[in-house]
Amino acid sequence: MGWNGGLTSPSMEEHFYPFLMERSPSYMGEDEEEHGDEDLSLVLERKDKDLLLAAELGKALLERNDQLMKAKDALEEELRETLEMIEQEKHNMRLKMEVQESEWRAQVADLESDLAEARLQMQQLLSEQRECGRESASAVQELSEQNQRLVEQLAQASQVEQAITLEMKSLKEENRDLTISRGQFAPCLQSLRSENALLLEKKKEMESQTKQLQEENDNVQNQLISAKEGVFQLQRQKEDAKSQVLQLELEAQKLRDSQRTLQLQLKELQDELHMRDSQFSMRGTHSSLHSEIQQSTAVQNHEKGRNSAETQSITSGYMDTYLTEREGDLLRENEEQTVRLQDQVTMQHIEITDLRKEVQRLKDLLQQNNADSTVKQAVLDRDEALMKKAELEQELARCQIEKESLNLQLLSTIQQKVMLSQELEAWQDDMQIVINQQLQSQKQQETQKPPESPQNSFLRRDSKRGKILSFFKNI
């Protein structure tokens, strides 16, 4: 094989196998050094072998190059398929990201609306909290005033107790003085001991009574607090009921407006029916239908006037709560008004049933006469409006009954609170009057009596001590 069958040029052979070009001089140098007398045939034979070896190596390199080109084409094809798959996945991911972005935007909008609602609720809660804080501050102020009065009463009781302890100390000193003459005053000493024991027992009783009074006062304060909470709740319920009544009145006004429009349409339809009665032979049937419509319109106007009068009488029945002697009369009037409202509700039930019967009868007449579809629709609309109006009036009456019952509960709670406060004030006034009278009588007795002997003064102290103990025992 020559150069054209193997390698393309010597430069290519030198590029791939440079060791061949380096090998020939080495062989030649060795041959010159070792075998200087070797002939030219051996050198040519060696060169031929080297050329054959180089040709075989070139052939192997070409085969390897073909394999590498095929592998390169396969890798390029695989790379192209991989790039197409990557582009497809990128497109799918882009679509998914757009869908997710739209979903995220919707979620963000929902979250923003929820955040706005939460802010509104937070503002409402803050306003309610401020209102509760003001109410609790007023309640705390009232309770602090009551506690101050109780502290003053306890201070007075402690002063009396200190006076008794001072008298007991003086008695002990006198007892020590009298131990010298025990033989002479033995019966008096015995009586003093018994009186001392009685004083100690009465002191214990007085302490127990003061504890009972404190417990009763605490119970009264707890009842007052619970009553105030009930009053606040009833006031809130009353405000809710008022707002519901206003909403019902607005709805009733809307229904009245729609009723006026329906009456105008009905009047126009009646004129058309009157025009058609002159053209057709069904005068008797249409005249009966006309009279039925007029009767139902008159009944509707009568019910409208009566219901408006009832609504005015109900709305004018709001009473102001006064803590006076007229509370019992107000309660009785509220009960009577509740009974009247219940009777009105039953009457409205009966009227609704009558209206439904009238509607059914008019429907039957319309089906028998085969009148115009516009007339049917107008009558049906009017009947539906009447039924809705009756239902709204019934709901309004029910709300009025609930409101009156809440007013009754509020008045009863206020009465209980007033009675408890009056009893507490009366008890405090009685205690103050009795204490003042006792102190004045003691001062008058001390100023009127002349100075006495030590024995008489001792007996006077015993009598004074007995009066004070009898006073606390009576309390």
Curated annotation (Swiss-Prot):
Residues 56-275, 340-413 form a coiled coil. Keywords: Coiled coil. It comes from the Eukaryota. Residues 286-318, 440-459 are annotated as: Disordered. Residues 440-450 have a biased composition (Low complexity). Residues 286-300, 308-318 have a biased composition (Polar residues). Belongs to the BICDR family. This is BICD family-like cargo adapter 2. It comes from Xenopus tropicalis (Western clawed frog).
